């Protein structure tokens, strides 16, 4: 469950290490975002020479959340950290690698490129 001012780890190789959620996309009064939801964020920490730099405003899709999510079969999925992948306007990732597992919900929300780059889909 991600909301405004939430800080997330970046799970790709764009050069950003941490982002801060500015807005949850998908409705005027939408407060929370989960796995597979798109947010607008600002880069809070980045490595020198990366594709993005500190202060850039980016779109990102959430790939891991600490808050458990119930699935249709009754099982729950939960991760150890909140993480996101920075995306372009056409929902393709800006980086070329994804680090760590991602949720299966990304496949249902048509983020196929992220699913194919991820080392593990849980």
UniProtKB/Swiss-Prot annotation:
Checking SUPFAM superfamilies in the record gives:
Ribosomal protein L14
Keywords from UniProt, A to Z, are: Ribonucleoprotein, Ribosomal protein, RNA-binding, rRNA-binding
**A Pfam family annotated for this UniProt entry:** Ribosomal_L14
GO molecular function terms listed in the Swiss-Prot or TrEMBL record: large ribosomal subunit rRNA binding; structural constituent of ribosome
Q: Which InterPro entries match?
A: Ribosomal_uL14, Ribosomal_uL14_bac-type, Ribosomal_uL14_CS, Ribosomal_uL14_sf
TM region positions: none
What's a single GO CC term here? Answer: cytosolic large ribosomal subunit
A GO biological-process term: translation
Provide the assembly information: Part of the 50S ribosomal subunit. Forms a cluster with proteins L3 and L19. In the 70S ribosome, L14 and L19 interact and together make contacts with the 16S rRNA in bridges B5 and B8.
Protein family membership: Belongs to the universal ribosomal protein uL14 family.
So what does this one do?
Binds to 23S rRNA. Forms part of two intersubunit bridges in the 70S ribosome.
**Can you name this protein?**
Large ribosomal subunit protein uL14
